[in-house]
C-alpha cells in the first residue's frame, strides 16, 4: 500500500512534532542530498594531497576500500536509527531518546559544529579550482585580482560562494530537491568522463605495481613513523570525503516515506560513493606518470602544490581543452556539494533550535511561508565563514594547514556525534524500538566496530599534521598548528561549563509541539 502524507505526519506526531516543513522530497531526492554532500568530485580532489603526502598510493589504493567499508558499517548503524526515529533532529534526537537530555545536548552541538565545518571546508576547498579556471580563461587574472595574493583571492572567492549558496537556499527552495537530483547524475557521468579521459588521453601511465605498493612521505615526519602515524593521517581523505550522509536524516521531515527513505539514503549514498570514489582515485594514480613532479616543492616545476591532484592531471593532459574539461566537471560538482551542505546544516540548526538548545533559538526555529528556515540558513553560513578566517594566514609548513584543520574539525565533530547514538543503541540492546528497516542481531558487532573506528580516527585527526605544528618542536609556528583539537575540545569544554552552570536547569531535550 502506498504511503501518504498523513502516514508521515502520523509518524512525526508520534515523535512529538507537527508538520512545519514542506514534505515534497522523494526517496531519490533524500538519497541525492547525502550523495551530493559526500561528493566524490569534491573530497577526492580537495583532500587528495593529504593522502598522497601522508602515505602515497598505498594510502589510496589500499586505504580507501578499508576505511570506506568501515564507514559503511557506521552508516548501516545510523540507517537503523533513522528508520526508528524519522525526524529532522536526526542524531541529536536519537541520542536524546536513547541516552537522555545531556547526551542529546552534547550530540546536537557536535553534529552542528561538524556540519558547519563541512560546509565551510567544501566552500573553501572549491576556491582553488575556481581560481585556476579563472586563470586559464582570463589572462592577467592571477596577478590583478586581490593584488595577485593567492590567499586573499581564495578567501574572497570563498565569501562569494557562501553568499551564492545562501541565496539559493533562501530563495530557491523549490529547486533544491531538483538540484540534488541533477547533482547525482552530474557526479555519476562527470566522474565517468574523468576516468575515461585519464585512461585514454595520457601517452604514459603508472604501473599497477606502483599504484598498490608505492609509499610516499612528504609530511616532514620520520619514515620510522610511516605505518603507525603518517599513513593513518592519509586516511583523512576517505574519512572526510565520505561524511555528511546524516543529511538524509535531517531531511526526514521533508521526505515522503521517511522511515524507509532516510535509512536507504544513508547507506546507499555511502556504498555508491565508496565504489565510485575508488574508481576515480585509481584513475588519478594510473595517470600519475610523473610522481617526482608531484612531489616537488619548486613552484617552477609544480605550480599547484606538493601532492596536488591537479598537478597529476596537468602533467597527464597538458593545460589544454581536456584539462579545462576535467576542472569544470569537478568545480561544478563541488558547488552542488556546498549548496547541499548548507541545506543539511540549516535543517539541523532548525531542529535543534526548535527544542531550545541554541542561543537565539526563538528566531532560529522560525520558518517562512514557504517552509524555509531563513534565519538558520543565514547563521549556518556566517558560522562557516567565521571558522575559516584562519585561512587568511599562510602556513609556514607549505600545506594549507587551516583548510585541513577545518576538515579535521568536520570529521572529528561529525563522527563523534555519530558515535554517541550508535553506542547508546548498542547499550539499549533488545529494548531498542526498532523501525521497519533494522539490522536484527547484527547490530551487536556492527555498532561495536563503528564505535572503535570512530574513537581511533578521532585520536589521529587531532594530532599535528606537520612537524612545525608540534608544540615545543624546533621551528614551531602557530600557522602550522592543527587547530582542530582547539576548536572541538574548546567547544566541548565551554559546553560542559555552560551545561553545569545553566543548561541543565532549563534544557529539557526534545519538546513536543503538538
PLM region descriptions:
Residues 29-45, 76, 157-164, 217-287, ...:
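Hydrophobic, membrane-embedded alpha-helices of multi-pass small-molecule transporters
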Residues 93, 100, 132-143, 215-222, ...:
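TM-loop-TM module centered on a large, flexible mid-protein loop between adjacent transmembrane helices
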Residues 128-135, 185-217, 239, 283-288, ...:
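Hydrophobic alpha-helical segments and their helix-loop junctions in multi-pass secondary transporters
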Residues 153-212, 243, 266-271, 407-420, ...:
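Membrane-interface loop-to-helix entry segments
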Amino acid at each position: 500500500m502506498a504511503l501518504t502524507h498523513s502516514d508521515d505526519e502520523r509518524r512525526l506526531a508520534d515523535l512529538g512534532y507537527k508538520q512545519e516543513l514542506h514534505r515534497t522530497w522523494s526517496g531519490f531526492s533524500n538519497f541525492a542530498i547525502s550523495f551530493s554532500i559526500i561528493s566524490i568530485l569534491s573530497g577526492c580532489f580537495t583532500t587528495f594531497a593529504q593522502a598522497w603526502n601522508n602515505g602515497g598510493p598505498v594510502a589510496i589504493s589500499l586505504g580507501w576500500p578499508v576505511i570506506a567499508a568501515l564507514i559503511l558499517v557506521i552508516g548501516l548503524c545510523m540507517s537503523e536509527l533513522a528508520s526508528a526515529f524519522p525526524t529532522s533532529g536526526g542524531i541529536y534526537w536519537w541520542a536524546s531518546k536513547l541516552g537522555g537530555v545531556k547526551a542529546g545536548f552534547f550530540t546536537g552541538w557536535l553534529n552542528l559544529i561538524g556540519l558547519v565545518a563541512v560546509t565551510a571546508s567544501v566552500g573553501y576547498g572549491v576556491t582553488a579550482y575556481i581560481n585556476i579556471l579563472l586563470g586559464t580563461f582570463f589572462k592577467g587574472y592571477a596577478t590583478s585580482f586581490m593584488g595577485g595574493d593567492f590567499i586573499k583571492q581564495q578567501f574572497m572567492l570563498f565569501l562569494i560562494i557562501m553568499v551564492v549558496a545562501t541565496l539559493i537556499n533562501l530563495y530557491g527552495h523549490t529547486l533544491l530537491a531538483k538540484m540534488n537530483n541533477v547533482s547525482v547524475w552530474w557526479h555519476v557521468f562527470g566522474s565517468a568522463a574523468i576516468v575515461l579521459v585519464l585512461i585514454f588521453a595520457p601517452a604514459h601511465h603508472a604501473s599497477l605495481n606502483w599504484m598498490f605498493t608505492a609509499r610516499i612521505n612528504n609530511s616532514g615526519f620520520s619514515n620510522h613513523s610511516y605505518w603507525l602515524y603518517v599513513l593513518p593521517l592519509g586516511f583523512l581523505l576517505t574519512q572526510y570525503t565520505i561524511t555528511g550522509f546524516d543529511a538524509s536524516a535531517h531531511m526526514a521531515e521533508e521526505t515522503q516515506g521517511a522511515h524507509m527513505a532516510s535509512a536507504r539514503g544513508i547507506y546507499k549514498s555511502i556504498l555508491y560513493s565508496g565504489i565510485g570514489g575508488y574508481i576515480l582515485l585509481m584513475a588519478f594514480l594510473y595517470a600519475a606518470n610523473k610522481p617526482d613532479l608531484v612531489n616537488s616543492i619548486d613552484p617552477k616545476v609544480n605550480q599547484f602544490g606538493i601532492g596536488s591532484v591537479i598537478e597529476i592531471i596537468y602533467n597527464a593532459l597538458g593545460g589544454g581543452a581536456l584539462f579545462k574539461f576535467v576542472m569544470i566537471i569537478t568545480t561544478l560538482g563541488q558547488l552542488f556539494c556546498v549548496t547541499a551542505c548548507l541545506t543539511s546544516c540549516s535543517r539541523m540548526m532548525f531542529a535543534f533550535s526548535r527544542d531550545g538548545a541554541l542561543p537565539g533559538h526563538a528566531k532560529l526555529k522560525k520558518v517562512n511561508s514557504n517552509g524555509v528556515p531563513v534565519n538558520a540558513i543565514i547563521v549556518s553560513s556566517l558560522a562557516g565563514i567565521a571558522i575559516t578566517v584562519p585561512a587568511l594566514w599562510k602556513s609556514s609548513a607549505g600545506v594549507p594547514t587551516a583548510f585541513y584543520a577545518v576538515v579535521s574539525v568536520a570529521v572529528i565533530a561529525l563522527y563523534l556525534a555519530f558515535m554517541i547514538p550508535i553506542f547508546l543503541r548498542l547499550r539499549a540492546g533488545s529494548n531498542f524500538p526498532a523501525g521497519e528497516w533494522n539490522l536484527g542481531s547484527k547490530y551487536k558487532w556492527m555498532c561495536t566496530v563503528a564505535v572503535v573506528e570512530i574513537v581511533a580516527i578521532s585520536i589521529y585527526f587531532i594530532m599535528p599534521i606537520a612537524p612545525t605544528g608540534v608544540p615545543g618542536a624546533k621551528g614551531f609556528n602557530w600557522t602550522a598548528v592543527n587547530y582542530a583539537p582547539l576548536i572541538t575540545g574548546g567547544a566541548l569544554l565551554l559546553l560542559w561549563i555552560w551545561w553545569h552552570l545553566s543548561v541543565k536547569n532549563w534544557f529539557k531535550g526534545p519538546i513536543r509541539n503538538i
